[in-house]
Amino acid sequence: MPPWAIAQRPWVTLGQSYGGFLTLSYLSLFPEGVAASFTCGGIPHVPASASEVYAHTFPRMAAKTQQYYDRYPADVERVAALADALEKQKPALPDGSPMTVERLQLMGSDFGMKPSFERMHWIIDHAFVDGDGTLTCGASVSDSFLMRAFERTNTRTNPLYWTLQEFIYADGDTMPIRWAAAEEKAHRAEFDTLARPLMFTGEAMFPWMFEQMPELKPFKPAMDLLMEDTSWDKIYDPQRLACNEVPLQAAVYFDDMYVDSDLQLDTLSRVGNSHAWVTNEFEHDGLHGSVVFKRLFDEALNRGDLRQIF
């Protein structure tokens, strides 16, 4: 039962990131329960396709990595040296899992938010036992780095975050997903673990995670089955969305690393009564400040979309 059925009145919804995906599901399946909707960096492409999503987001991951190196040029050499050291020394993380170059790449998963570059630079600056940011040939990877790498990449408290990452694009009868992110990465030589400068990956999951990370290993048999599945429940109804009457006000972040702005705008062009505010002033987490929601709310209010509510 949808929550508004319990409340016995339509809801005004605010969807951040994946919350925007849920918003379009609500508008597809239960529009009578929604009075108005706001989304921030979270309009999925309809029709949904995991392969299409990663074809758009991997170039954005590369661009964000380059922005990081542009800000901290010395880290090009430091990250390369760290990758070489990980390959040679094969250190273990606090939970016993291997600290690989692939896991180092995964540490860029928050490059689409602030202040991720600063956090990464600080971690890289303390990656070697020397601890002063210098590069010493043969230096050991520091315990401090391994602890912080573990903290940034483990999913002990939210294992379903990665487990369901690609299945949010499984909409009705579809082709097998078959590790869409890994497939896209394999076709991009610049993301190879031996490529330099080393590229960081964003919000993307890979088969090795379910082989190496203790909290994800139990899900591997299920993942192998789900990756071949072709029949899923429908998430979105394009026809119903085209006829949508519920006011939808969306913040689209032009440089969003996670939810491609071109795909968002393509979807919104086919959703009735939708309005987009496109901005490059904010990253994916722009809602945290005091500007974004106020802008969305004021636009909807001034348009008269909230007249029956407030």
Language model: regions and residue ranges:
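Catalytic histidine-centered segment of alpha/beta-hydrolase-like enzymes
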Residues: 258, 277-295, 306-309
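Conserved hydrolase catalytic core segment
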Residues: 9-49
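Conserved alpha/beta-hydrolase "acid-adjacent" motif
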Residues: 116-120, 256-263
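Short beta-strand/loop motif that positions the catalytic acidic residue
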Residues: 244-245, 249-252
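Conserved acidic catalytic loop of the alpha/beta-hydrolase fold
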Residues: 1-10
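Alpha/beta-hydrolase fold active-site neighborhood
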Residues: 90-229
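A catalytic-pocket lid/entrance helix-loop region that shapes and gates access to the active site
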Residues: 32-87
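Short alpha-helix in the alpha/beta-hydrolase fold that links the catalytic acid
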Residues: 123-125, 246, 260-268
